[in-house]
Curated annotation (Swiss-Prot):
Assembly notes: Heterohexadecamer of 8 large chains and 8 small chains.
Cofactor annotation: Mg(2+)
Annotated binding of substrate, by residue: 103, 153, 157, 275, 307, 359
Binding of Mg(2+), residues: 181, 183-184
Protein name: Ribulose bisphosphate carboxylase large chain
Entry's family note: Belongs to the RuBisCO large chain family. Type I subfamily.
Note on cofactor: Binds 1 Mg(2+) ion per subunit.
Length: 417
């Protein structure tokens, strides 16, 4: 049905725009594939139905308005689709994804399909709360300025008792870290129930705070099997006076995540977001969804921190692409820049920013590169890079803090990192 391919269409400021990387089956023309994507992800179905006459499809249909071949790839195209804003429920990332990526990825005429980027018009984010607090409010709450923040995931991630877990938290925070973190798989298992962990961690937080004079946090993982249980854990964290809780937003789901974000804003809790399961969705180059789309969705659904890869030691091109979605998380206005993987100019207007978290395989020798790449508004998480120190956890934390302060001072003095 080629009525969904409309190259003459002028996109509206209120449209949601999507860039899909399409690989059609052999023999299927690109225009036909692009039209099929637009139809299946909006008002179309596999046949003409008489009830189409009861609505104005021209007002509600998605339109494929541009198709460009991908240079260097055989039979691969970027298809641009515009969706009228009325197709989406206000304040629901869940509904946005159900529409745009819900069904179309299993389409027979396509060999593969990947959602590369979305342009969210300012009218739509205005219906979301977004991050519970955002970067500036977080700095004010923590009273920490002019440098990246330091974190560490407590390992071994599974198997410690609550008491020993709390001890590891205390040692890291006492040594100089700002945050420690529950691993994403730490929920409430037989060897360590969530309530016991929360209690011992709270004790560690306040002891470290009293001895260092710095505000300390531990990402208490509230992720649970039901959203009611998740809220119960968040409430208990607040009752203990903890400054921050954590959620696995992809495994926990956007609906639960947005509920938790509302609770965190109402109750002064920061919200740390882990992206467990993201590689299932974003790892394949030609099928699935790019992480920058998941990052934009999280900024709308709500979170103050999100894991965003490390950049260090990878290819240069990957560095640019990672910095592209790091900017999408932090900045108000991001210009279209294809070299950084940004297909559309994105204007967030006044929505608070999210702090990117660099985590996984980094250690103290990466500090100069990390401070240069990420700047101040980031959390640098050294897991094995703290707990793997030959002298113990606290000296590992000291090493990271000293390295960070040295790099920040060198940068401020204008030296070459």
């Amino acid at each position: 049905d080629l009525t969904y391919y409309t190259p003459e269409y002028q996109t509206k400021d209120t449209d949601i725009l999507a860039a899909f990387r399409m690989t059609p089956q052999p023999g299927v023309p690109a225009e036909e594939a692009g039209a099929a994507v637009a139809a299946e992800s909006s008002t179309g179905t596999w046949t003409t139905v008489w009830t189409d006459g009861l609505t104005t499809l021209d007002r509600y249909k998605g339109r494929c308005y541009d198709i460009e071949p991908v240079p260097g790839e055989e039979n691969q195209y970027i298809a641009y689709v515009a969706y009228p804003l009325d197709l989406f429920e206000e304040g629901s990332v869940t509904n946005m994804f159900t529409s745009i990526v819900g069904n179309v990825f299993g389409f027979k005429a396509l060999r593969a399909l990947r959602l590369e980027d979305l342009r969210i018009p300012p009218a739509y984010p205005k219906t979301f709360i977004g991050p519970p607090h955002g970067i500036q409010v977080e700095r004010d709450k923590l009273n920490k300025y002019g440098r990246p923040l330091l974190g560490c995931t407590i390992k071994p991630k599974l198997g410690l008792s609550a008491k020993n877990y709390g001890r590891a938290v205390y040692e890291c925070l006492r040594g100089g870290l700002d945050f420690t973190k529950d691993d994403e798989n730490v929920n409430s298992q037989p060897f360590m129930r969530w309530r016991d962990r929360f209690l011992f961690v709270a004790e560690a937080l306040f002891k470290a705070l009293a001895e260092t004079g710095e505000i300390k946090g531990h990402y208490l993982n509230a992720t649970a099997g039901t959203s009611e249980e998740m809220m119960k854990r968040a409430r208990f964290a607040r009752e203990l006076g903890a400054p921050i809780v954590m959620h696995d937003y992809l495994t926990g789901g956007f609906t639960a995540n947005t509920s938790l974000a509302f609770y965190c804003r109402d109750n002064g809790l920061l919200l740390h977001i882990h992206r467990a399961m993201h590689a299932v969705i974003d790892r394949q180059r030609n099928h699935g969804m790019h992480f920058r789309v998941l990052a934009k969705a999280l900024r709308m659904s709500g979170g103050d921190h999100i894991h965003a890869g490390t950049v260090v030691g990878k290819l240069e091109g990957e560095r640019e692409v990672t910095l592209g979605f790091v900017d999408l998380l932090r900045d108000d206005y991001i210009e279209k820049d294809r070299s950084r993987g940004i297909y559309f100019t994105q204007d967030w207007v006044s929505m608070p920013g999210v702090i990117p978290v660099a985590s996984g395989g980094i250690h103290v020798w990466h500090m100069p590169a990390l401070t240069e790449i990420f700047g101040d508004d980031a959390v640098l998480q050294f897991c094995g890079g703290t707990l793997g120190h030959p002298w113990g956890n606290a000296p590992g934390a000291v090493a990271n803090r000293v390295a960070l302060e040295a790099c920040v001072q060198a940068r401020n003095e204008g030296r070459d990192l």
